[in-house]
Amino acid sequence: MACGLVASNLNLKPGECLKVRGELAPDAKSFVLNLGKDSNNLCLHFNPRFNAHGDANTIVCNSKDDGTWGTEQRETAFPFQPGSITEVCITFDQADLTIKLPDGHEFKFPNRLNMEAINYMAADGDFKIKCVAFE
């Protein structure tokens, strides 16, 4: 998958928040935020799907360990609207990543790779990043 934005050397530590704000395309089908060590080692593949890959209004999360995908986890909370500005906040610790959605709903995804720092972020799909912040 070609990536719209790739950032490295982030050095995001446990407890710190990565906020990503951007604009969803009016005809959005899906978008992806990948976080981890590099493109083959992802502690989080965050993939909201409006209508893609057989899913509708579902968030699909996964991990990738040395190039091998893990088991998908689906979240039915879906506060995203095509054509709108949206923001996601992601924090992590040794056990889990916590994803805070635009409507305030939070859910957890296991830190399967036991990452102690997130150094890589990639974004792709029907989402134009406007701002990335660390808190």
UniProtKB/Swiss-Prot annotation:
Residues that bear N-acetylalanine: 2
Membrane-spanning residues: none
Compartment list: Secreted, Extracellular space, Extracellular matrix; Cytoplasm; Secreted
Domain (Galectin): residue spans on this chain: 4-135
Gene3D superfamilies recorded: 2.60.120.200
Pfam family of the protein (one): Gal-bind_lectin
Residues reported to bind a beta-D-galactoside: 45-49, 53, 62, 69-72
One Gene Ontology cellular component annotation held by this UniProt entry: cytoplasm
Gene Ontology biological process terms in this record: apoptotic process; cell-cell adhesion; cellular response to glucose stimulus; myoblast differentiation; negative regulation of cell-substrate adhesion; negative regulation of neuron projection development; negative regulation of T-helper 17 cell lineage commitment; plasma cell differentiation
Subunit composition and interactions: Homodimer. Binds LGALS3BP. Interacts with CD2, CD3, CD4, CD6, CD7, CD43, ALCAM and CD45. Interacts with laminin (via poly-N-acetyllactosamine). Interacts with SUSD2. Interacts with cargo receptor TMED10; the interaction mediates the translocation from the cytoplasm into the ERGIC (endoplasmic reticulum-Golgi intermediate compartment) and thereby secretion. Interacts with CD69.
Protein name: Galectin-1
